[in-house]
Structures are given as C-alpha cells and as structure tokens.
C-alpha cells in the first residue's frame, strides 16, 4: 500500500459557511451554515467502529457530535430496538444566525438568534432531507482573550417528542473555545 495502515472505510465531512454584513454595519451580521457528513466502507463488509458514526444534538462539545441546539447531546438520529442512539452513516444540518454586536471594546459581546435543522440517518438510502429536526433560539457570545469564545444559548427543539418522547422545552447550552 501507498501509506501504512489497515483502515477500510472513508469518512467525508463537508461544511459551507457564509457571513454577510447587514445594513452596512459592522455590528449586524447574518451567518449561514450547511454541514454534511458521510461514512462508508471502502471494502464491503468492513466493520465501522461505533465511535466513527455521526451523532447529533446539543452544543457539539461532545466528541464526534454535530451540534443541534434545542436537543440533548447525542439525542438525534437512529436508535436500536431498546431505544439507544446508535449513530448513523449520514449527517445533514443547515442553520442561520442573526448576530448583533453589543460592544466591540474592550471585550466583544454579541447577541444572536438562530434557526437550525438537522438529522442523522442510518444509511444513504434512508436519507430524507425533508425529515429534519428543527430548533430556534437565542444566545450570547463573549470573546475573552486569551481564553477564547464563551457562549450561552437557549434552544427550543420543536421535534423533541419524535426524538426522545418528551415535550419540547427550552434547553440551555454552553459553548467554549470555538470562534465564530
């Protein structure tokens, strides 16, 4: 082989982000994002370890988890017969945020409102881009040097009844260390 190793699967991640300043101001911006992930065997029949699959929900600070605010960490996606999340081979998510800079000096403070939709699917054949779990919410971001970004979000997951059988409610999410 060209490179050493015995991995017989391919995991592909795609992310597109777009920022647009609004009202000719450096204090108001629109941020949009689209995430897509796919994992499959190169050699058919090769087992893929469960930690390599895609998981979704929460703030995304849990390893290998696509963030979807308004839902618990790793709560969105395929489940086994006893209701445990098993992860999926396909992840898709879109989102939009409207960001407002309250202060830029000495410590930048931003307020935001967001809308997101996403899901994890067992396989490419079972992927349905119209079967998304939706959420909206509000948040705040502080950019503290040299610590980095600290964020607080309240998200409302409209489809929690489908995801975990519970009524929709506002959930708090803490962000740390990720930039805009």
Could you describe each region identified by the protein language model?
Residues 1-108, 113-114, 121-123, 161-165, ...:
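C-terminal outer-membrane beta-barrel translocator/porin domains of Gram-negative envelope proteins
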Residues 111, 143-144, 150, 179:
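Flexible, small/polar- and glycine-enriched "cap/hinge" segments at structural transition points
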Residues 97-99, 135-141:
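Short glycine-rich, acidic/polar surface loops and turns
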Residues 87, 143-145, 167:
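Surface-exposed coil/turn segments at beta-strand junctions on protein surfaces, enriched
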């Amino acid at each position: 082989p060209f490179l050493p190793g015995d991995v017989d699967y391919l995991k592909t991640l795609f992310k597109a982000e777009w920022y647009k300043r609004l009202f000719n101001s450096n204090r108001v911006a629109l941020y949009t994002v689209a995430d897509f992930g796919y994992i499959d065997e190169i050699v058919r029949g090769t087992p893929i370890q469960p930690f390599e699959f895609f998981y979704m929900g929460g703030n995304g600070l849990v390893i290998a988890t696509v963030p979807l605010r308004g839902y618990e960490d790793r709560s969105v996606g395929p489940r086994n017969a006893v209701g445990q999340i098993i992860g999926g081979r396909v992840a898709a998510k879109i989102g939009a945020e409207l960001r407002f800079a309250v202060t830029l000096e000495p410590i930048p403070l931003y307020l935001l409102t967001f809308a997101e939709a996403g899901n994890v699917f067992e396989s490419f054949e079972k992927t349905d881009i119209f079967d998304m779990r939706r959420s909206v919410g509000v948040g705040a971001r502080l950019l503290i040097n040299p610590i980095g970004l600290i964020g607080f979000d309240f998200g409302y997951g409209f489809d929690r009844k489908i995801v975990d059988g519970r009524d929709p409610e506002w959930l708090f999410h803490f962000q740390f260390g990720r930039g805009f």
